[in-house]
């Protein structure tokens, strides 16, 4: 962090692994320095992971709803993985591949142990960078299996053909037998395009939500009004384009 032009900022070369890019304006450098003479800075090694795990508190609620991150408390993650073990068997992590296609910062995959079978994709590159940082601090993931991917807009094209999907994952979803051993494990976003006023014809769709996606346009005739729900678009694409895989989905339905 550098003090420059009466403010503290993060140099561009160090932006890859930080939570956000921001400049904090300091009117009086002496006052700022005196403040830290009274208080101790949090040690990086002790508090870094703690801050990363609570990163969602820095993100506005409406953005969290649209992007689908940060809505899986640890106890629910553990319970869902127990359900998977009960259903698929004790050795399921060695027998199945797992793709969280709405991974956020990877919280849902915490606790799984076979990193060679785990894939995580998320909408924002900043979240990918956070997962890379977590890998450096011991998270059980492979960097080449963590990637930026807009599940509702990007096509299933492998990296070797200029796309975004890891070649190993593309090979799985393209193979009829391997696809049967793929678990799409997600807690998808739940924002919808409409609101109460729009439902009764007196309001408008929210901009930048579900009606703007490629998947909404592709399957609107089949899912109708349900297409306003982002999670429904995730499910229809999985059902149509990754047939015979297993869907492990958080839902109140």
Regions found by a protein language model. Name each.
Residues 60-68, 216-222:
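Glycine- and acidic
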